[in-house]
Design a protein with these regions (language model features):
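Positively charged n-region of N-terminal signal peptides that target proteins for export
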Residues: 1-5
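Bacterial N-terminal signal peptides
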Residues: 7-16
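Sec/Tat signal peptide C-region and signal peptidase I cleavage site
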Residues: 18-24
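Short, glycine-/small- and polar/acidic-enriched structural segments
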Residues: 25-173, 178-189, 204-206, 212, ...
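Sec-exported extracytoplasmic/periplasmic mature domains
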Residues: 46, 55, 77-78, 96, ...
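Pocket-lining segment of extracytoplasmic ligand-binding domains
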Residues: 162, 168-266
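Secondary-structure end/capping motifs
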Residues: 226-314
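Conserved C-terminal helix/tail region of periplasmic/extracytoplasmic solute-binding proteins
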Residues: 300-353
């Protein structure tokens, strides 16, 4: 009997070692799209930083660029990737509402002027009344517009929205500005930078007025193994350390990112100024624990429900739960699909990765 027990124990041990080995060779795929705060992912991949951290945690990580932002999120939601760069609003509206339990593993930055409203012959949000405004509907620009109107005692009924793709929005505004003295647009960088340069154009509201509300993160499947999460967080904050240093290595990293982004160094540096990057892991962890993120997600889920992003059959905005770093939940505690933990960012801050 003891002999049988020994054989069973050995078999279990062998099986465990085989599974561990398989996990060690597991390959994870991360997708990102072009945006100032996400350009570091290409640097992380090309510099070898990702390979170094993946090797440390016995896994492989592939980082892939997909130019179409929404398509990248759809691919993640469909199971083609283990993680994806996206905003807090899109993380709720697409994967979370779609039933994919997702975690904002790395809070990289928040928009601090990268999104804005520009119009001709006007100097305030109230001058939008009665106008037609070009915008990517149901995007973070739409959220920004809603907040701007709310803060100025207005609603969307006070103007007409013209749904426009982000690829066309700058060109169309520039063309319209030549014949329409009331042309107006709401967009994000780099198109925002282009429309602001139009003669007579005024920026009347931008995301610096709602700091901490348009959040850019690396979102991963909540069941992504611990070693992969640690490798990703370690690689990201090593890149942040390089990027924020005044060293030649840091300068070269930023030059490389500007090149990846398809713009000049000056343009990229200007966009960085309107992006509140969390260069230090402690800052990111503190933000994840802040009351601000709870307040923001309340705004975001209200906007998402009011604009039909929960689907026509959703009875209310509580059908999906959102969990925060302190364990508190807004929405259905039995159906948590979006999480904002501080755990791994804090580990990076404490030097525990």
């Amino acid at each position: 009997m003891k002999k049988i027990a020994l054989i069973i124990a050995l078999a279990m041990l062998i099986g465990l070692s085989v599974n561990t080995s398989a996990d060690a060779n597991e390959k994870y795929r991360i997708v990102w799209s072009h945006y100032t705060g996400w350009e570091p992912w290409q640097f992380i991949m090309e510099s070898g930083i990702m390979d170094k951290w993946a090797s440390k945690y016995n896994c492989q990580v592939e980082i892939i660029l997909v130019n179409d932002y929404i398509e990248s999120i759809n691919m993640y939601t469909a199971g083609q990737f283990d993680g994806c760069t996206m905003t807090n609003m899109d993380a709720l509206a697409i994967p979370a509402i779609g039933g994919i339990d997702s975690t904002a593993l790395i809070i990289g930055d928040f928009s601090n002027g990268n999104d804005g409203i520009v119009l001709l012959n006007g100097d305030s949000v109230k001058d939008l009344k009665g106008r037609k405004l070009r915008i990517v509907e149901l995007s973070v620009s739409h959220y920004l517009l809603t907040r701007a109107l709310e803060m100025n005692g207005m609603t969307e009924r006070d103007l007409t929205l013209i749904n426009t793709s982000d690829a066309d929005i700058a060109g169309l505004f520039i063309t319209e500005s030549e014949r329409d003295p009331k042309a107006a647009v709401c967009t994000w960088n780099p198109p925002l930078m282009q429309v602001r340069n139009v003669k007579g154009a005024n920026l009347v509201f931008d995301s610096s007025k709602i700091p901490g509300e348009i959040i850019d993160s690396l979102v991963v499947r909540s069941d992504l193994p611990d070693n992969a999460k640690k490798a990703l967080v370690g690689a990201w904050f090593e890149a942040m350390s390089i990027m924020s240093s005044r060293s030649k290595e840091g300068q070269n990293a930023i030059k490389a990112m500007a090149k990846f982004a398809g713009g000049t160094l000056r343009e990229f540096q200007a966009q960085l100024k309107t992006t509140a990057m969390f260069y230090k892991a402690q800052e990111a962890a503190d933000f994840a624990r802040s009351a601000k993120i709870k307040e923001t997600m309340e705004y975001v889920r209200t906007f998402s429900f009011d604009h039909g992003l929960y689907g026509e059959n959703a009875p209310d905005k509580d059908v999906v739960g959102i969990e925060f770093a302190d364990g508190s939940v807004i929405g259905d505690k039995g159906n948590v699909k979006l999480r904002f933990p501080a755990k791994y960012m804090q580990m990076a801050a404490d030097g525990d990765l």
